[in-house]
């Protein structure tokens, strides 16, 4: 069974945490992860881009001038796409871009993402957090520095803590998430994932053996 060091807020190792092989030790399925990201990003699209065609743009329906005798080029409508202010040809239309992924595949992708981070040495575990000592941004920043965490950091907590959420917003590259809301995309986009020990245990309990 895999094990990781548990650190306190000063960066000192205070114990070991066992990692479930079925959650953090599977072979990452990179094809599935790519599919998950494609579905996730597609579902983020609003699909509200819309232009007017010649049938929808306002303007006279009559012929702008006679077919012959004016010396001008032939035109049938000022709503034609070749006119300034006319309709748009082949422009974007409102569309539902949403895609779906079966529940089992979503779970498998999540476990693959966690295993990918674990195998790459990109997971760290924090024993506990004193909310009184992390009410300020500098306090939380000091903890990250003690743990030698830089870049895009995902900090996973077991429950909502408004003080940590507030102070975390002021730290560039830090994303604070709850274990119950954690998704595959958040894990993948992070350079390092920091779990509070209780949050890690909740994740393991939920996905163990699945």
Region roles according to the model:
Residues 1-46, 91-210:
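Extended polybasic, low-complexity segments that bind anionic RNA or targeting/receptor surfaces
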Residues 46-49, 55:
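Short, structured surface segments that line ligand/substrate-binding pockets
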Residues 54-90:
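Glycine/serine-rich anion-binding loops at beta->alpha junctions
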